[in-house]
Amino acid sequence: MENTARAILRYAHLSPYKARQVINLIRGKDIATALAILSQIPKKSARIVEKVLKSAIANAEFKGMDIDNLYISKIHAEEGPMLKRYTPKAHGRATMIRRRFSHIYVYLAEKQQEDK
């Protein structure tokens, strides 16, 4: 198996849909480009994904990988548990409010050097 580093953030108070909007912009990019893209996005989800990406970079550095040669091989957000709350409505009814959580996974790998 190739040399990879990963970071996982569980129970992020962020819906998976909003996390995926940011994640889709950086999938497959090298880490310098991904950090530049994330720093320009004015969303809470961008700050959270940026923090997980920096953690994955630190893990790669600890494993002795070349930081300048890393790219995001896999990144995805899955749905975590949901807190269900109820709010009263007219005529004795109530509606459910779902407070969503997500798990964010980031995998980094080194680019393969092509021999000519």
From Swiss-Prot:
Q: Which Pfam families match?
A: Ribosomal_L22
Superkingdom of the source?
Bacteria
Stored CDD domains = Ribosomal_L22 (cd00336)
Determine if RNA-binding is one of this entry's keywords.
yes
User: What are the record's GO terms for cellular component?
Assistant: cytosolic large ribosomal subunit
Can you state the subunit structure given in the record?
Answer: Part of the 50S ribosomal subunit.
Q: What does this protein do?
A: This protein binds specifically to 23S rRNA; its binding is stimulated by other ribosomal proteins, e.g. L4, L17, and L20. It is important during the early stages of 50S assembly. It makes multiple contacts with different domains of the 23S rRNA in the assembled 50S subunit and ribosome. The globular domain of the protein is located near the polypeptide exit tunnel on the outside of the subunit, while an extended beta-hairpin is found that lines the wall of the exit tunnel in the center of the 70S ribosome.
Identification of the protein by name: Large ribosomal subunit protein uL22
Tell me which species this is from. Answer: Sulfurihydrogenibium sp. (strain YO3AOP1)
